[in-house]
């Protein structure tokens, strides 16, 4: 098996860890706390990864003249995503109660799928060039894929009461890594360059930041402050551990 594809599959499997929480926590008194903690982990993790791991590391390698095009690109990205979210909020079933939780799970699935595809492309490409560097990159991905899987599985399961649906949504997001790797192997091997990768990463980081601030933050701000703090601290610890490892 292609080394890059192998590492991408391993990374994608860690996203499925969210299913463990979906299956094992059946006590209704703990449901709200589990959701709050998992969403808080996802919130801080998405912000830290998108800003420090993706955006800042990407633009520092760009020439100064590229900053204007990056700014314009970000504005366009934010506008499109913002309008998409506003349209979704107009849908009646997404307005109240469990509908909001389901909507959050769906949005997290879409966001993380879009995040995982370029991640799979990059992991596969790097690993096939430098396997040791590919291993480091994979360990970084694994650290943030775990809370990402939880942020999909828990909201979907507790809003629909369907384990099957929760599993399917997490699987969709997880397959993004593999899709990206296969896309890299089949189509992008000859045309992929640093500029294309940079703009893909910038696009992904802008999506992650907006989703974290527009969708996840409003969901957790009114919840139990202790649970929110625990989730944020866990997310920060995971991020720091990832930095130390790499």
Question: Where is each model-derived feature located?
Answer:
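Intrinsically disordered, metal-sensing/regulatory segments
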Residues: 1-246
């Amino acid at each position: 098996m292609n080394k890059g594809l192998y590492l991408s599959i391993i990374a994608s499997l860690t996203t499925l860890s969210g299913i463990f929480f979906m299956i094992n926590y059946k006590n209704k008194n703990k449901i709200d706390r589990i959701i709050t903690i998992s969403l808080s982990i996802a919130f801080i993790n998405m912000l830290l990864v998108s800003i420090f791991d993706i955006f800042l590391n990407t633009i520092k390698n760009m020439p100064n003249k590229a900053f204007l095009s990056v700014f314009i690109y970000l504005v366009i990205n934010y506008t499109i995503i913002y309008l998409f979210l506003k349209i979704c909020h107009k849908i009646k079933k997404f307005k109240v109660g469990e509908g909001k939780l389901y909507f959050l799970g769906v949005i997290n699935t879409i966001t993380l799928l879009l995040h995982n595809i370029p991640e799979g492309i990059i992991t596969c490409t790097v690993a096939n060039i430098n396997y040791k560097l590919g291993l480091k990159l994979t360990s970084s991905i694994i650290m943030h894929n775990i809370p990402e899987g939880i942020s999909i599985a828990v909201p979907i399961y507790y809003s629909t009461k369907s384990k099957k649906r929760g599993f399917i949504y997490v699987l969709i997001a997880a397959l993004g890594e593999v899709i990206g790797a296969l896309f890299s192997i089949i189509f992008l091997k000859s045309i992929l360059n640093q500029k294309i990768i940079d703009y893909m990463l910038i696009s992904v980081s802008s999506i992650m930041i907006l989703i974290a601030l527009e969708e996840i933050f409003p969901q957790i701000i009114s919840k139990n402050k202790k649970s929110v703090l625990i989730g944020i601290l866990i997310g920060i610890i995971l991020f720091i551990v990832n930095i130390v490892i790499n």
